[in-house]
């Protein structure tokens, strides 16, 4: 059991026979009445997002997830194949199951795959990845008056805003959680 006061982004709970992940949470203490926690929950099986309010201190069952380190080995048709690094078992996931993080997924990348009742719930990528810039506009000397960013396409096809001095062929570090440029590699 977990208290609603302990909710954090990414916390997994069980409600109505399903696993829900906390996407957003806000502790509210109104001037009159008791405190409560307003949350946005994402259903791990269906992907639907709902808003739910809990009383402060209310306890709910915490989902016990099995986290396994797996390697993305290859893509076959519409499925991404992951191999367990210890047992060599393969798990196949669709792009819909992985979500928008698929844009940073590379072959031989190690990821954490979360299971609940032998069912894949989520895929956690590393917080940062290093990718090569494949397309971007050339930077013009002295063109930094507007804040200095331009769009760039990296080797996996993802689009990221980068500083003007970045050119094609450079390797850059990207935060996969916020889709932001962190620096050159």
Swiss-Prot record:
<comment type="function">
    <text>Involved in peptide bond synthesis. Stimulates efficient translation and peptide-bond synthesis on native or reconstituted 70S ribosomes in vitro. Probably functions indirectly by altering the affinity of the ribosome for aminoacyl-tRNA, thus increasing their reactivity as acceptors for peptidyl transferase.</text>
</comment>
<comment type="similarity">
    <text>Belongs to the elongation factor P family.</text>
</comment>
<dbReference type="Pfam" id="PF08207">
    <property type="entry name" value="EFP_N"/>
</dbReference>
<dbReference type="GO" id="GO:0003746">
    <property type="term" value="F:translation elongation factor activity"/>
</dbReference>
<keyword id="KW-0648">Protein biosynthesis</keyword>
<dbReference type="Pfam" id="PF01132">
    <property type="entry name" value="EFP"/>
</dbReference>
<keyword id="KW-0251">Elongation factor</keyword>
<dbReference type="InterPro" id="IPR020599">
    <property type="entry name" value="Transl_elong_fac_P/YeiP"/>
</dbReference>
<dbReference type="GO" id="GO:0005737">
    <property type="term" value="C:cytoplasm"/>
</dbReference>
<dbReference type="InterPro" id="IPR015365">
    <property type="entry name" value="Elong-fact-P_C"/>
</dbReference>
<dbReference type="InterPro" id="IPR013185">
    <property type="entry name" value="Transl_elong_KOW-like"/>
</dbReference>
<protein>
    <recommendedName>
        <fullName>Elongation factor P</fullName>
    </recommendedName>
</protein>
<dbReference type="Pfam" id="PF09285">
    <property type="entry name" value="Elong-fact-P_C"/>
</dbReference>
<dbReference type="InterPro" id="IPR001059">
    <property type="entry name" value="Transl_elong_P/YeiP_cen"/>
</dbReference>
<dbReference type="InterPro" id="IPR013852">
    <property type="entry name" value="Transl_elong_P/YeiP_CS"/>
</dbReference>
<dbReference type="GO" id="GO:0043043">
    <property type="term" value="P:peptide biosynthetic process"/>
</dbReference>
<dbReference type="InterPro" id="IPR011768">
    <property type="entry name" value="Transl_elongation_fac_P"/>
</dbReference>
<dbReference type="InterPro" id="IPR012340">
    <property type="entry name" value="NA-bd_OB-fold"/>
</dbReference>
<dbReference type="InterPro" id="IPR008991">
    <property type="entry name" value="Translation_prot_SH3-like_sf"/>
</dbReference>
<comment type="pathway">
    <text>Protein biosynthesis; polypeptide chain elongation.</text>
</comment>
<dbReference type="InterPro" id="IPR014722">
    <property type="entry name" value="Rib_uL2_dom2"/>
</dbReference>
<keyword id="KW-0963">Cytoplasm</keyword>
């Amino acid at each position: 059991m977990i208290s609603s006061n302990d909710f954090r982004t990414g916390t997994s709970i069980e409600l109505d026979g399903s696993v829900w992940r906390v996407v957003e949470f806000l502790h509210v203490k109104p001037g009159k009445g008791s405190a409560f926690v307003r949350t946005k929950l994402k259903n791990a099986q269906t992907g639907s997002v709902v808003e739910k309010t809990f009383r402060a201190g209310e306890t709910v069952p915490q989902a016990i997830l099995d986290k396994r380190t797996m390697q993305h080995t290859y893509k076959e048709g519409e499925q991404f194949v992951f191999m367990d690094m210890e047992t060599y078992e393969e798990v196949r996931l669709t792009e819909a199951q992985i979500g928008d993080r698929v844009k940073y997924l590379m072959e031989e990348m190690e990821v954490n795959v979360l299971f609940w009742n032998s069912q894949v719930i989520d895929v956690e990528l590393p917080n940062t990845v290093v990718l090569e810039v494949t397309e971007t506009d050339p930077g013009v000397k002295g063109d930094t008056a507007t804040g200095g960013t331009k769009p760039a396409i990296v080797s996996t096809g993802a689009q990221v805003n980068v500083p003007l001095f970045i050119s094609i062929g450079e390797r850059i570090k990207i935060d996969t959680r916020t889709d932001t440029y962190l620096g050159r590699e």
